[in-house]
Every structure is written in structure tokens, then in C-alpha cells.
């Protein structure tokens, strides 16, 4: 598991208190998340001219809440979290966080949605790639240069009660 895996989520009413939020050590990520949240997505809602949403996860090892902008890829209310890491050789930390704790939050503009992550494979994964490629011309290059099979997680709507029930 990635030793830097540290991302998080808020908890439901009546459950354990939310983990402390630790902003990203990356100035770009930290500033983008702060602008996005302060303006309900009116600012900080793009990266390289492409739309993003804010993914809030729980650190796999630390339990600390982390927030990251990810590309906005959505179909029928389900979001895709594409672990491309801009074509880097490793998966982003949030990917490992979602494997360890699949409940997360997506903020899409002013709307925050509770989601549950599940890795997609085969034909379902290809369908997500087709949608993602149509909106982001960089993904094909990332797949060609990363040297790895880039994972995709479907972020499906979840209810707070799902986590405690």
C-alpha cells in the first residue's frame, strides 16, 4: 500500500466524530480545494481547462480527512474516480484510501454527495474510459505512458446509514 495514502470523509450524524482535516502538502491542490469550497465550485472548478470535483476520503493508514480535485466524469449520477495520477507510474494516494474505506464525499459545485467506491473492470471499465476520453484528451496519453493499468473506481450514491448499518 502507498505510504502516502491519507485522504478522508465526514461521518454521519450519530456516528464517530469526523477525522481531523489535513490540507494537502501540495500548494496547488490545497489552494484549489480551498477556492472550490469557498465559492461552491465557482472558482477552482477546472484543472487545465477541464472540470473537476472535490473528492473527500479517509486516510487508509492515518484516518485523516484529505481532499483532492479529480476530473469530473459522471454518468447517471455515478462519478468515476480515474486513478491516472496525470500518467505517473503509481496510483494516487486517494485510490488506496478508497480501497481501505470506500465511503467518501464528492462535491460537485454547491452539491455534496455521499458515495461508495467500487473498482470497475472489463467492459464496464471500457465504458468509463470511452466517456472519460470524450471529455479529456489526456487520458489516452496517460494510459500509454504510465506503464500500469490505470484503475477506475465507480463512485455510486450512498446513504449515511449505509456506513453504520
Predicted segment positions?
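Charge-rich, low-complexity terminal tails
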Residues: 153-165
